[in-house]
Regions:
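Short leucine-rich amphipathic alpha-helices used at interfaces
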Residues: 8-9, 427
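C-terminal accessory/connector segments of nucleic-acid motor ATPases
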Residues: 323-592, 599-604, 610-611
Length: 612
């Protein structure tokens, strides 16, 4: 199902219709948290388990799921190999399993994650539980791989176990008729971007691959009178949340961002998505461009190119797969950075500051990110660029002091403290993880008011408060090994590098279509295994072809006109049959004669014509 196609409904509605807990497996912690908050806001019991919450909280969530107090349980794929989770799972009444971003299980996909291969172990534990795999971007090869890796057909519901059971593959069309796809080659991308933003009214997203460039580009646009801000994974979580809300609420027109922005963003009226740099694959481009026009109204997806893009694209392929010796060096530096010795570190989840790491060990962030991805695919670690860590609170006054008038507590402060004490029992002894959305609902506060109230209590030295934040983390999935023994398999490096090149070639093909090329919608649909019966008629290729055809027709019409005028230029009457000797069709000649008569350039007497 394409981006914005309503994937959540496909499992939420059927799961609500039956008893039991629905387990949703997703790699996107930020999206996981947003989904949980949305469900809770409408009164549906939902929880998420990830590395940003305490062990005690995880145990509490799992116990609640066992006793029926949780309807939707969101977990990361790494959680499926956790002993505590598997032990508790045995006692749950699981009614449904949903695999989101299912393309991550396929090595043919653009975002392969080895942890997804563990999902099949869950199927062996719960063989009769229905399983739904969802993705917005899957080629036919990826779809085939998903059905094989998840062994659809081998695990049939008990009531039809005696019959052959085949997987049902449902696919919505990838065609987005309301989106006009455009590739534009220009000398100055900044100038062209500003021109496009002024010509298309409404909200826009501008994607660029460089964090520094987001800030520079946003500043340039603001100087030109355009209302913009910027967003990337390196920003403080509070700033990211604020800017996201400003953009969604219409206070900001243009969001300049890296691809860290967009997952889980549900804004229907985005009129324009512009890419300043070419994405790595058509899957990525289609997903990001598809954030435009979810309301069905006319929208635009524009890719800006210049003469240097092909060279930089080729260089990017090399950067995505740095030499194995470099990957080993990054691994060593990570272990030094976290003070992890040989044969230790398994299971450790540690906060990772990319900028500090790169400065300390003289690396470039893009190279480190590529190395981390390879180490993750080789199953040495898990890198989460945005790990959602819940807010934490500890009361630092004695219980009897809470009623002391000297504290001058406001109504909101008193109400919030009472609510906290009602639901959390460790506030006086530990920094306790709290659920912001749940408490806001109980206190009838907005999130901003809730945050302001806790900050006020912190300033009065009543509590210690650490706001919710999204921080990068690295989890070591095995003990540290000597880098000489670090193995990066062929399937992780050479094979994936080859598939990366193949996807890049398709993206270059998309960029390269000219007036004689393939309709962009047709090319995209063909890539995803879908046939378009006729060209879209709206992309820049189709429009250029239509203009060229019109110009050609006008040119040909002028040639016929000149040939007729030359024949009649002697001023003598000519029989109409002589015109056939000019070599043009009867329709073209008839149309030309009618034009000349309308212009009063010739007269006709029966079958004879004379130039006036």
């Amino acid at each position: 199902m394409p981006t914005g196609g309503g994937k959540s409904i496909t499992f939420q509605v059927p799961a609500l219709a039956v008893k039991g807990v629905c387990i949703i497996i997703t790699p996107l912690i930020a999206l996981m948290q947003d989904q949980v908050e949305h469900l809770k806001a409408i009164g549906i019991q939902a929880e998420a388990i990830h590395s940003g919450i305490s062990r005690n909280k995880i145990i509490s969530i799992l116990d609640n799921a066992i006793f029926g107090a949780v309807k939707f349980l969101y977990v990361s794929p790494e959680r499926l190999s956790n002993e505590l989770f598997l032990a508790k799972l045995a006692y749950m009444n699981v009614c449904f399993i949903t695999v989101d971003e299912a393309h991550c299980i396929s090595q043919w996909g653009y975002d392969f994650r080895p942890s997804y291969l563990k999902i099949n172990e869950l199927r062996s534990i719960l063989p009769s539980v229905p399983l739904l795999a969802l993705t917005a971007t899957a080629t036919p090869a990826v779809v085939k791989d998903i059905t094989e890796k998840l062994e659809f057909g081998k695990h049939s519901p008990a009531d039809i176990a005696t019959t052959e059971y085949r997987p049902h593959v449902y696919s919505m069309s990838f065609l987005r008729r309301n989106i006009t796809y455009v590739v534009r080659y220009v000398e100055d991308k900044y100038v062209e971007l500003a021109r496009i933003l002024r010509s298309v009214e409404g909200t826009a997203i501008v994607y660029t691959r460089n964090r520094k460039k987001t800030k520079e580009l946003s500043r340039e646009l603001n100087q030109q009178g355009l209302n913009s801000t910027y967003y990337h994974a390196g920003l403080d979580s509070a700033i990211k949340t604020q800017r996201q809300h400003q953009w969604q609420d219409g206070e900001i027109d243009v969001m300049v961002a890296t691809n860290a922005f967009g997952m889980g963003i549900d804004k229907a009226d985005v009129r324009l998505v512009v890419h300043m740099d070419c994405p790595d694959s058509l899957e990525e481009y289609y997903q990001e461009a598809g954030r435009a026009g979810r309301d069905g109204e006319l929208s635009y997806a524009v890719l800006l190119c210049d003469n240097s893009d092909r060279t930089s694209f080729s260089r990017r392929i090399a950067n995505a797969f740095p030499p194995k010796d470099y990957v080993r060096r990054v691994y060593d530096h990570l272990c030094f950075y976290f003070y992890i010795g040989i044969d230790s570190g398994y299971g450790a989840t540690l906060e990772f500051d990319m900028d500090t790491f790169c400065i300390k060990y003289h690396h470039f962030p893009t190279s480190v990110e590529s190395a981390l991805k390879l180490l993750q695919n080789a199953e040495y670690l898990v890198y989460q660029p945005e790990n959602d860590e819940a807010a934490r609170v500890k009361i630092i006054v004695a219980p009897y002091q809470l009623d002391d008038p000297i504290l001058h507590l406001t109504h909101n402060e008193s109400m919030l403290l009472e609510t906290l004490l009602r639901y959390y029992g460790t506030l006086f002894s530990d920094m306790t993880y709290i659920e912001t959305s749940f408490l806001c609902n109980k206190c009838s506060m907005t999130e901003d008011t809730f945050h302001f109230t806790l900050k006020s209590l912190s300033q009065k030295r009543v509590v210690n408060y650490v706001p919710r934040r999204r921080v990068p983390t690295i989890t070591f999935t095995r003990d540290r090994v000597d880098s000489d023994r670090l193995n990066i398999p062929r399937a992780v490096y050479e094979d994936m590098q080859q598939r990366y090149r193949e996807r890049a070639d398709k993206m270059l093909e998309y960029m390269s279509q000219g007036v004689d090329g393939v309709c962009r919608q047709r090319l995209i649909l063909d890539y995803f295994g879908e046939q378009l019966q006729e060209d879209c008629g709206t992309c820049d290729v189709c429009r250029a072809r239509r203009i060229a055809a019109r110009d050609s027709k006008e040119t040909k019409s002028e040639k016929v006109r000149q040939a007729v005028l030359t024949l009649l230029s002697d001023g003598k009457p000519h029989h109409v049959s002589e015109l056939k000797l000019l070599g043009y069709s009867s329709e073209q000649l008839a149309a030309t004669l009618q034009e000349l008569r309308d212009d009063e350039r010739l007269s006709m007497d029966g079958s004879e014509i004379t130039l006036i």
